[in-house]
Structures are given as structure tokens and as C-alpha cells.
Amino acid sequence: MKVGAEVRRRGNREDGRQVMARLKKTVVMVGMMGAGKTAVGSALARGLNVPFLDSDEEIERAANRTIAEIFARDGEPFFREKESQVLARLLRGSPCVLSTGGGAFMAEGNRRMIREQGVSVWLKADLDVLWHRVRHKATRPLLRTPNPRETLRALLEARDPVYAQADLAVESGEGTVEQMAVRVREALATRPDVLETDE
């Protein structure tokens, strides 16, 4: 059985030849809420013709409750435990693109699992970009505070040094989702142990 997923992507080579690429490890998108992990990860997966999975959606499916409901009923420690269990299960599967919740990479055990079985890509965004993207969303339980922007700033300050431990980092600022996905694809191309091409 061949390891990885062999795919054909639409290359922009000058000679017009199609580029074959094989994803050999799961790509794990990490970063703050609002960084674009789900949107960019989904676009990346489409471009590589591999499955896209969202760990938060998988947790909600397993619990038959929303993330906000899990936080309210069972608390954050319970959620983090379930998050680690789901992450371990997804990393054991075939190579794919996996989006994780903003706090998933904070747990050392999760970082170790990702390092051993996949490759982490940090979508890096500043406070203004993140706030613009999340301020009108009511689905972020950690931002249900009297001053959500300040809460977001404090989270960013605490988490950025940990996100910096990711294998790769890509700026998530200006540009379309597709352009950001291309930047991630280019970063992955520097890792032949992750993405193999015939170029």
C-alpha cells in the first residue's frame, strides 16, 4: 500500500506540464482564532486533492454538542481532553489537511503528537487582523468577556511564543484565501518529507 496521497494539482509551469505531488504527512494548521485556519486549510486541501478535516467539527460531531455548549456544560479542561483524543485519532489517519482550534497547540502533548506524526503550519496574524475577523462572531466562548478585544490581545500575547514552535510559519494577513493557501503550499514544498513533487 502506498503511503500518502498522490494527487495532480494545476501547476503554473511555463512549459504547461502538470506537476505531480504526494502528501506524505498530515498538515496541521495552527494559530489564533480568526487566523484563517479553516478557510485556508480547506483551500489547501482542495488544491492538493486530499481530505480536509476540522478538529472542532469532529469534536462537535462526537459530542453531539457545539463547542460553546461543551464549554458551558463541561468546562474548558474537559474540552481540551476531548480535543487531544480527537487529534490523536485524526493524526493516525491518512495524510490530510487538519485545522485545529486556537488552543490545541498549547498542550505539550498535542505538540509532540503533531511533531511525530505530521507537520505544523502556523498561520500568523496580528491583533487588528484577528479582531476584524472575529469581533462579530458569537461562537467564540473564550471571547465572552466584558472586553473581548483585550481578551483576544492577552490570548495572542500568551500563545504566540508557543505557536512559534510550529514547523512552518506563514503570514495570514493581506490577500485572498487562495493566495494564502498558495503561500502555505510553497512553504510545504521546502519539506520533501511532507510534500513530494516531480519537479
UniProtKB/Swiss-Prot annotation:
Cofactor binding note: Binds 1 Mg(2+) ion per subunit.
Record localization: Cytoplasm
Cofactor(s) it depends on: Mg(2+)
Residues annotated as binding ATP: G34, A35, G36, K37, T38, A39, R140
Superkingdom of this protein's organism: Bacteria
Keyword DNA-binding (UniProt): no
Molecular function via GO: ATP binding; magnesium ion binding; shikimate kinase activity
Single Gene Ontology BP annotation: amino acid biosynthetic process
Coiled-coil blocks: none
A Pfam family the protein falls into: SKI
CDD domains for the chain: SK
HAMAP family: Shikimate_kinase
Subunit structure: Monomer.
Function comment: Catalyzes the specific phosphorylation of the 3-hydroxyl group of shikimic acid using ATP as a cosubstrate.
Protein name per the record: Shikimate kinase
